[in-house]
Amino acid sequence: MLLENFRPQSRLVTKTTRMDRAKFPVIDAHNHLGEAFGGGWDKKPLNQLIDLLDEAGVVHYVDLDGGWGEDILHAHLKYFKEKAPERFRIFGGVDWRKWESMGAGFPDWAAGRLKAQKESGAQGLKIWKPFGLHVRDHEGQLVKVDDARLSPIWEMAGELGMPVMIHVADPVAFFDPIDETNERWEEIGRNPDWAFTSPPFPPFMDILNGLGSLCPPSPFYNVHWRARGMLCREPGLGRSDAGRMSELLHRHLRAAR
């Protein structure tokens, strides 16, 4: 049997406490409604989702899928926000692909599009992981997270009162060499596009330190976070506890011991 086919079932017997509903009203501040992330709620009856949220005690739901493009943003605003405006908050995004054609005027153009998204109903800005890893400017240069040219976007978010959910980097092992010493070897083998070995990608800490030096006027929430030092240094930076299950299970149990 190949290691990749190994699916062990734990024989450890433990007490099971089933929690079907939260004790307090829940705000799900980081989630995805679209099919790309496995939910597919944009293809199902909305009442089915509302019933599920009611059952779990989720009173408010933040959908970040609009960050993938304005077509998705408008579709989700129409399908979810218009029908249940008090339940859903939909975030917009930046179309980095336009930088090549817009040239040096891209940051101002993107700030203008963010304002238009706000007017359409977007209530926040989602920045996806390609920022800092793949996004390039009109000259083909990799754009750093703290690139000063992007100030118009962050300033517009602050002016509009739009929080920014920003996902940069990934688990640190994804940036290490993919060899027998990498603790995520099996996971990366199943998902090779999760490998960001430096070089050619920027070092893990360069990306996170760039985020810490942004000092934006709008609240930033560091998604899939690295916390303590950055939170102390940056009063405008918050954190989202969203995490990969493999990270939570093995690392926090070790820390507890």
Please give the residue ranges for each predicted region:
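Histidine-centered divalent metal-coordination motifs
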Residues: 30-34, 167, 224
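Histidine/acidic-residue-rich catalytic or RNA/ligand-binding cores of hydrolases
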Residues: 37-41, 73-76, 176-183, 230-240
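Active-site gating/metal-coordination segments in enzymes
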Residues: 2-8, 72-196, 249, 254-256
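H/E-rich (His + Asp/Glu) clusters that bind or coordinate divalent metals
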Residues: 3, 43-44, 50, 203-210, ...
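Active-site neighborhood of phospho(di)ester-bond hydrolases with catalytic His/Asp-centered motifs
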Residues: 27-29, 62-65, 91-93, 126, ...
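An N-terminally biased module of ancient metal coordination in phosphate/nucleic-acid-related enzymes
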Residues: 1-83
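Short, acidic/polar
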Residues: 39-53, 102-117, 234-237
